[in-house]
């Protein structure tokens, strides 16, 4: 078959692009390096615990040792499966703030303001409460309420209100400041990923999906991308398309593939013996991510997941509840309660996000503590720190160097200190007093600004939102223009979280789906 388009990466963006282009009559080849999403833990909400760190579903990346994290290297999960990160993420439906997108437009990116992107969010949305000025219904991307509540989280919400945050039922109206329960991408207690939502619902026969197909490089002829060379189960194959190729391999994979293809910083490519096809210094630069500071407390006389799952009977009860009703802890998103607040009065819109969980543990992947506990992870939504993604070898199988450069600016360290102080102030409010909270992370020993900045380096970890590594911009230095076309190369658009010029003020999965909706519209309009 002669392909009109090849899409590299069947993740959050690629699956959307595949459906929109193929249903418009284009012949589309969708390539995914991972396997099919038939692993049962992909679809059970709590299954992220078994997908992250699993080579069946995760690229198993690690960061470089980070000076801002006191020399620690972090695990850096990315989805390697149909659906990409939407198959292993926290399922939270969050758009960010109107100010994020209006800021993009003010940077010269015409068509990317809040009023421009809101219809794109609504297009794919299937909102549990139906259509409204802010929400869509009948789309592929299901948004539901969570299927359980916790008294301890209700009390944390009251504490946040006592501290000064307004209660909210909807973080997605353009101004997300407030506290409330997150809404999630689930349907009837099952995870909704983009493979299920978009690829499986595609009508017609113009879409072909190939899994276990890892792209080695783009094929570039006379300044135009015309196809890809990929490995599929040990066999090298080549595919070509007559129209544009869409690179949707994510904020790590897209710059890596470009660099392997000879598109990127010239010195880096030459260092690894790769012929420079098109020098573009910013490919892989500008990495932005949200760093979460895991603040945690031991509680007295509280029902939390720690205590609920402490016995075999408790675990059996949890499993039975999910099997019979699709409710209970197995239907949980990793974080149930959320809040958006400002780190200081000088900040115009919320720059902190809380992910609040009725559980504590020493580190991700380790057992829950044997006492009642609550975690309130707080992250800086608009970091100043900028990192880099760079190939380490001409071999496509070698992981790139990922250096987020967390807490590398005075401003980011100051926000981290303010975030820890604020989390303590909320826990000190009267609604939480009955639990006699005892801080275990970072711990009461850290009190001065200098001590808390050090503590941020000890408890900080990624919240899995890498972006901006192949940014769009009105300036000629940006790899992409506002149409997501690659400057200086024909036949190529990049469509994923890497294209953001600045990270959004919230979780990044739904903005990535919006970007794909807009990209498909632009491509189909010619």
Where on the chain are the PLM-derived regions?
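Conserved redox-cofactor binding core of oxidoreductases
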Residues: 105-225, 231, 294-316
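Short, hydrophobic/aliphatic alpha-helical segments
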Residues: 60-77, 238, 450-457, 494, ...
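N-terminal glycine-rich phosphate/pyrophosphate-binding loop and immediately adjacent elements
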Residues: 1-122, 279-280, 290-299
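FAD-dependent oxidoreductase catalytic-site/capping-region signature
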Residues: 2-3, 118, 124-173, 179-182, ...
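Glycine-rich loop(s) and the adjacent beta-strand/alpha-helix scaffold that form part
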Residues: 23, 27, 35-37, 218, ...
């Amino acid at each position: 078959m002669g392909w009109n388009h090849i899409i590299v990466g069947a993740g959050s963006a690629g699956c959307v692009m595949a459906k929109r282009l193929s249903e418009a009559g284009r012949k589309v080849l969708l390539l995914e390096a991972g396997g099919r999403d038939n692993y049962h833990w992909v679809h059970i909400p709590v299954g992220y615990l078994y997908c992250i760190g699993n080579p069946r579903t995760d690229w198993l990346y690690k960061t470089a040792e980070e000076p801002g994290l006191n020399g620690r290297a972090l695990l850096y999960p990315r989805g390697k499966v149909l659906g990409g990160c939407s198959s292993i993420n926290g399922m939270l439906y969050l758009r960010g703030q109107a100010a994020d997108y209006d800021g993009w437009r003010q940077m010269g990116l015409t068509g990317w303001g809040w009023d421009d992107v809101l219809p794109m969010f609504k297009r794919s949305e299937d909102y549990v409460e139906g259509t409204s000025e802010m929400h869509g219904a009948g789309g592929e991307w299901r948004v539901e309420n969570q299927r359980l509540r916790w008294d301890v989280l209700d009390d944390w919400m009251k504490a946040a209100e006592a501290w000064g945050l307004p209660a909210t039922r909807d973080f997605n109206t353009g101004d997300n400041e407030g506290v409330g329960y997150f809404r999630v991408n689930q349907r009837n207690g099952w995870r909704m990923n983009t493979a299920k939502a978009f690829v499986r619902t595609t009508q017609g026969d113009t879409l072909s999906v190939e899994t276990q197909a890892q792209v080695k490089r783009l094929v570039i002829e006379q300044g135009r991308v015309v196809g890809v060379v990929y490995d599929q189960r040990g066999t090298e194959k080549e595919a070509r398309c007559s129209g544009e190729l869409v690179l949707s391999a994510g904020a790590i994979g897209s710059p890596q593939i470009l660099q392997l293809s000879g598109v990127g910083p010239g010195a880096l490519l030459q260092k690894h013996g790769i012929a420079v096809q098109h020098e573009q210094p910013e490919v892989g630069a500008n990495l932005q991510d949200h760093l979460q500071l895991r603040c945690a407390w031991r509680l007295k006389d509280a029902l939390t997941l720690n205590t609920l799952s402490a016995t075999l009977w408790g675990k059996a009860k949890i499993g039975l509840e999910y099997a019979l009703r699709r409710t209970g802890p197995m239907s949980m998103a990793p974080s149930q309660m959320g809040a958006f607040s400002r780190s200081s009065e000088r900040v115009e819109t919320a720059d902190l996000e809380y992910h609040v969980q009725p559980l504590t543990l020493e580190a991700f992947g380790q057992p829950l503590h044997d006492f009642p506990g609550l975690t309130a992870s707080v992250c800086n939504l608009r970091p100043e720190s900028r990192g880099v993604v760079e190939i380490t070898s001409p071999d496509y199988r070698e992981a790139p160097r990922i250096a987020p450069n967390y807490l590398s600016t005075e401003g980011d360290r100051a926000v981290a200190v303010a975030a820890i102080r604020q989390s303590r102030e909320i826990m000190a409010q009267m609604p939480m007093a009955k639990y006699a909270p005892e801080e275990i992370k970072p711990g009461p020993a850290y009190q001065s600004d200098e001590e808390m900045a050090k503590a941020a380096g000890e408890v900080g970890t990624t919240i899995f939102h890498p972006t901006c590594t192949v940014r769009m911009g009105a300036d000629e230095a940006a790899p992409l223009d506002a149409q997501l076309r690659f400057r200086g190369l024909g036949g190529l658009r990049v469509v994923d979280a890497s294209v953001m010029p600045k990270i959004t003020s919230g979780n990044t999965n739904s903005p990535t789906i919006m970007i794909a909706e807009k990209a498909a519209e632009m491509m189909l309009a010619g």
